[in-house]
């Protein structure tokens, strides 16, 4: 490839190293991802985003077939819904393990190993002979598939300067978010066909295998300490004054101890950083609610509107359209407002400048979920609740994207572990909320059930104005010290 040849040329002819002095180069440095050609960066973003998309696609892939699976395995709908809960819990534990591991061994090997196992795990899921087998392999599928989700934010922080990062973060988080909305559209028709629900997972295997092929070809290492270590290993000894991170290698650590430390690190960061706690509560609540709606969505159309599974699956298009529409609205507006705040601040950007769009997003999500719930409750013409679900999807994107970018901007190269801490709480709520879907709407009906969810989100979202005004002071009072973790 042209970009790679440029980097190789620079590597061999332009870099001269004298121990204890900086490495000089007149062209893009293959060991500094921020200087790579834009096309090389975008290729990494596309591969990582595809991994994350398919991981999230797998989250709701069997939602339209819950009744079919329950019938085959002679189980209740709630027990089968555990397939979504355990998958999300697998993603949670994956974030605990894979994000810090990538900060020891690099991003690329973690991506490739984890995603290879994820693809292969679709085989035993499709061949499950009982519910226990189905649930166990769903958990491990979520665990190993989480490599894109747990390290994506960190990879983008590796690749782009803060001023250029916003639009790529929006693309990444949008692709991440539309996966659960697209999967049921396809699965809805599979569930009512004669080929069986198993093909929902065969299709996921095919898509994952195709993406894995391109990942092996195109994905590059981006984590700076790992690249710097390789750089100094090639051009000279590491001096005493070089960063400690460059002297650490995985060979010096016992695997068991490393995994234990890896699981502890994101939790420790989360609990010690007030801004992360606020962000985690807000993102966790809205993520749990969107997961709850996705699981209950097809049943709403079947019970209230007598739609077939295939047509009920098509209704997920409204959520997906809302997600896409928010990108074209939120991305330019949020970036312009961020640039305005930077200019007003004398050209210096602050992480808190990412937050204003989140205020709007939470408000829209609450409007959308109330409109969806009450119109479905009274069986108003089907187009009206789809408007509510579209607004809800847009509100989700407009809330989660700015908050995720806020975490990335605040923690830089340690954003993988910081984001993992937030995702732990987010995924925990995402795993728990769907379990309550059936009982919530049965006892309170769709109207009052959605009203309760809206009030919970309102309470959590009150932290955003506080963070916008006092976030910098809070960060200065509790500065992040990576050596403590």
Swiss-Prot record:
InterPro entries: MFS, MFS_dom, MFS_trans_sf
CDD domains in the cross-refs: MFS_Tpo1_MDR_like (cd17323)
UniProtKB keywords: Golgi apparatus, Membrane, Transmembrane, Transmembrane helix, Transport
Cellular location(s): Golgi apparatus; Membrane
Pfam family, one: MFS_1
Keyword Transport: yes
Gene Ontology terms: biological process: transmembrane transport
Family stated for the protein in its record: Belongs to the major facilitator superfamily. CAR1 family.
Name the record gives this protein: Uncharacterized transporter SPAC750.02c
Organism, scientific name: Schizosaccharomyces pombe (strain 972 / ATCC 24843) (Fission yeast)
């Amino acid at each position: 490839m042209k970009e790679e040849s440029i980097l190789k040329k620079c590597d061999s002819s332009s870099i001269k190293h004298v121990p204890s002095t900086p490495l000089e180069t007149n062209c893009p440095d293959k060991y500094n991802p921020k200087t790579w050609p834009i096309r090389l960066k975008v290729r990494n973003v596309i591969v990582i985003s595809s991994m994350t998309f398919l991981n999230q696609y797998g989250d709701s892939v069997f939602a339209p077939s819950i009744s079919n699976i329950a019938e085959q395995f002679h189980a209740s709908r709630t027990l089968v819904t555990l397939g979504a809960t355990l998958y999300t819990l697998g993603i949670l534990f994956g974030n605990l393990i894979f994000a810090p591991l990538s900060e020891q061994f690099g991003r690329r090997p973690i991506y490739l190993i984890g995603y290879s196992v994820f693809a292969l795990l679709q085989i035993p899921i499709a061949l499950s002979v009982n519910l226990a087998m189905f649930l166990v392999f769903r958990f491990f599928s979520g665990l190993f598939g989480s490599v894109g989700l747990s390290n994506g934010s960190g990879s983008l922080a590796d690749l782009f300067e803060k001023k250029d990062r916003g639009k790529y973060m929006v693309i990444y988080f949008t692709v991440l978010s539309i996966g659960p909305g697209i999967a049921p559209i396809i699965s809805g028709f599979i569930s009512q066909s004669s080929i069986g629900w198993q093909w929902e997972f065969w299709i996921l295997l095919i898509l994952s295998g195709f993406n894995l092929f391109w990942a092996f070809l195109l994905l590059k290492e981006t984590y700076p300490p790992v690249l710097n270590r390789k750089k100094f290993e090639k051009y000279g000894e590491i001096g005493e004054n070089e960063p400690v991170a460059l002297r650490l290698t995985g060979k010096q650590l016992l695997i068991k101890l490393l995994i234990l430390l890896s699981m502890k690190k994101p939790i420790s960061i989360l609990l010690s950083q007030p801004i992360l706690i606020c962000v985690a509560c807000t993102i966790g609540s809205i993520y749990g609610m969107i997961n709850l709606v996705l699981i209950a969505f097809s049943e709403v159309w079947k019970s209230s509107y007598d739609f077939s599974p295939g047509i009920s699956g098509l209704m997920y298009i409204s959520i997906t359209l809302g997600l896409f529409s928010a990108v074209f609205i939120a991305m330019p507006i949020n970036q312009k407002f961020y640039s305005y705040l930077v200019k007003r601040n004398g050209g210096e950007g602050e992480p808190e400048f990412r937050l204003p769009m989140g205020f709007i997003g939470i408000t829209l999500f609450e409007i959308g979920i109330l409109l969806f719930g009450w119109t479905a409750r009274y069986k108003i013409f089907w187009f009206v609740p789809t408007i509510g679900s579209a607004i809800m999807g847009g509100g989700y994107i407009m809330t989660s994207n700015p908050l995720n970018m806020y975490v990335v901007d605040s923690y830089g190269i340690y954003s993988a572990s910081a984001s993992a801490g937030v995702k732990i709480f987010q995924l925990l709520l995402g795993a728990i909320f769907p379990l309550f879907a059936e009982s919530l709407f049965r006892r309170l009906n769709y109207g009052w059930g959605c009203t309760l969810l809206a009030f919970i989100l309102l309470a959590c979202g009150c932290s955003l104005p506080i963070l916008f005004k006092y976030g910098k002071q809070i960060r200065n009072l509790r500065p992040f010290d990576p050596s403590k973790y």
